[in-house]
Every structure is written in structure tokens, then in C-alpha cells.
Curated annotation (Swiss-Prot):
It holds the Pfam family Ribosomal_S7. The keyword RNA-binding applies. Part of the 30S ribosomal subunit. Contacts proteins S9 and S11. This is Small ribosomal subunit protein uS7. GO terms for molecular function: rRNA binding; structural constituent of ribosome; tRNA binding. One of the primary rRNA binding proteins, it binds directly to 16S rRNA where it nucleates assembly of the head domain of the 30S subunit. Is located at the subunit interface close to the decoding center, probably blocks exit of the E-site tRNA. The gene is rpsG. Keywords: Ribonucleoprotein, Ribosomal protein, RNA-binding, rRNA-binding, tRNA-binding.
């Protein structure tokens, strides 16, 4: 992997319905095999379901709150020191924070039991806004690992 220069970040256009860049990124996370129309249908369907279940809540705000709640602050990275592997807690960069939270929400939604992906996603997002659900469990697990390995934080990268 060449280390010559930093690759410029590609600018992602906001989604057509809400004009939100984060929603557009989430669409790309949900998308499989280049089927953006399917991903779009799933996400907009989930946001409509959120609006139906909670007419008082703005679905876009619920989405943003869910993403922010799931974002991890610290994670562990393996570091080899003197023949032993240590799990060293490190702070998560903001871009990775967003990517991880979106990925965890997607994975948690996939594991749910509801019929359609839109329903699964809507329920996962609603649970994440309330601080529970599979994605929140994953974040708490990562935080617990970092807390348990706090003693190795002096091995920072």
C-alpha cells in the first residue's frame, strides 16, 4: 500500500427526498450489489413507518439521534508487544465513528425477525433512539472491551 499521499475524500451528494448527506451515506451502506433503488425504497419505507408509529417524531431527527446514540467513543486495537498481543483501547476518529454506527445498525436490523427490511430498520432505529436494541448492545460491548483493557492504554499507537 503506497504511502505517498492522502487520498481525497469523495463528496457524497445529499439524498433526493430529505437533502441529507448522512442519509445518503446510510443508503450506500444498506445497498447491496449496486442496487441503489432497492436501498432507497428500504430506507424511505423505514422512515415512513417511523412517522406512522410516532406522528409527533420527525423521522429524519429520529434517524440522526439513532446514529449519534450508536456512535462508539473508544474501541480496542490489537498491538503486539514482546511476543504478546494486547487489546489497546484507542479513541475512534469521527469518520469511522459514523461508519461503524451505520454498519452496526444495518447488521442489527438484518438479524431482527420482522417481515420486511424496512420494518426491521424502522424498529432498530426507534430502539436506538431509546438507547436499546442490537446496535446499542454492540456499542456497549465495544465500550466494555475498551474499559476492561484500560490498563494497556499506555501502549497507544
Amino acid at each position: 500500500m503506497p504511502r505517498r499521499r492522502e487520498v481525497p475524500k469523495r463528496e457524497i451528494l445529499p439524498d433526493p427526498k430529505f437533502g441529507n448527506v448522512e442519509l445518503s451515506k446510510f443508503m450506500n451502506v444498506i445497498m447491496e450489489s449496486g442496487k441503489k433503488a432497492v436501498a432507497e425504497r428500504i430506507i424511505y419505507g423505514a422512515l415512513e413507518l417511523i412517522e406512522k408509529k410516532h406522528p409527533d417524531k420527525d423521522p429524519l431527527e429520529a434517524f440522526t439521534v439513532a446514529i449519534n446514540n450508536v456512535k462508539p467513543m473508544v474501541e480496542v486495537k490489537s498491538r503486539r508487544v514482546g511476543g504478546a498481543n494486547y487489546q489497546v483501547p484507542v479513541e475512534v476518529r469521527p469518520v469511522r465513528r459514523l461508519a461503524l454506527s451505520m454498519r452496526w445498525i444495518k447488521e442489527a436490523a438484518r438479524k431482527r425477525g420482522e417481515k420486511s427490511m424496512a420494518q426491521r430498520l424502522a424498529n432498530e432505529l426507534l430502539e436506538a433512539t431509546e438507547g436499546r436494541g442490537g446496535a446499542m448492545k454492540k456499542r456497549d460491548e465495544v465500550h466494555r472491551m475498551a474499559e476492561a483493557n484500560k490498563a494497556f492504554s499506555h501502549f497507544r499507537f
